[in-house]
Amino acid sequence: MKNTADITVLGAGSYGTALAISLASNGHRTLLWGHEPEHIANLKKDKCNNEFLPGIALPDLLIPEADLATALAASNNVLVVVPSHVFGSVLSQAKPLLRDDARIIWATKGLEPETGRLLQEVARDILGEHYPLAVLSGPTFAKELAAGLPTAISIAGTDVNFIKDLVELLHSPKRLRVYENDDFTGLQLGGAVKNVIAISAGMSDGIGFGANARTALITRGLVELTRLGEAIGAQGATFMGMAGLGDLVLTCTDNQSRNRRFGLALGKGLDVETAQQEIGQVVEGYRNTKEVYTLAKRLGVEMPITEQVYKVLYQGGTPHEAAKALLGRDQKSETPDS
């Protein structure tokens, strides 16, 4: 089947729209699907995603589409950008509508709810072995990407030719640099764990602890990410790159991060429900914390920061209690195994 679009993006939230804007601005006809017809109608009418990215015009090559079948028939390249807790359901909806030559990439950051499985495993369970898979991950705030500010990300997947084609689609000398990576597992994990650590950094700043504590959390958070990654077969070096250290620093230090702002609200004394309401959009790290904690417990991997964030979010703990528990841990050597 011939393509009528270069790529289809599933998910018309802030990040999906930002990636679609970047692709269309790069000269590629891009279909953007969203599950709410009224939202898509507003995108068409306003030529702007006023709900998530107000003030940023949609390029002419970006075509909003409310019908999933039409969107998936338009291109064999499918970019999924939906929250991790609906990733499986969106793939299940898409499966009977996918073209035989479809190739699937996602920019979703997270693991499967309840099980803590990588999204690669979820995709294979639903779609089988037929379709090439890839993941896009790295330090990206949607608003900056949509505005054309310089951004760098990493990409990994199961098919070399698919990766090459994606790099050609995504790369822009003016706005987006794409690094190829051969660690499919590592890129998927980094995007989930960094959200958990960002919540901890926000809680620390909300309490008023300052830059020293924030930096310690980022550094030890990187240790936790690497430890868990190596336990599931990822390459430790991956976490020194865009999808590890890069995403971790970005999300922990800038208030554009919903996860960091969520943590700030908790640190200032708000309860979990009120803090989420204050953010007003999906806080991926809330679910990611449970996913990462579940995976770490299943594998017997020690992740003290993650454990304390989990206690605050799901067991009624407080940020002050979490800080006391972390500072009161037994002394040990600062090594990769500590």
UniProtKB/Swiss-Prot annotation:
UniProt GO BP: carbohydrate metabolic process; glycerol-3-phosphate biosynthetic process; glycerol-3-phosphate catabolic process; glycerophospholipid biosynthetic process
Binding residues for sn-glycerol 3-phosphate: K109, G138, T140, K194, D247, S257, R258, N259
Gene Ontology MF, one: NAD binding
Enzyme class: oxidoreductase
Signal peptide: none
A Gene Ontology cellular-component term: cytosol
Membrane-spanning parts: none
Family: Belongs to the NAD-dependent glycerol-3-phosphate dehydrogenase family.
Protein's UniProt name: Glycerol-3-phosphate dehydrogenase [NAD(P)+]
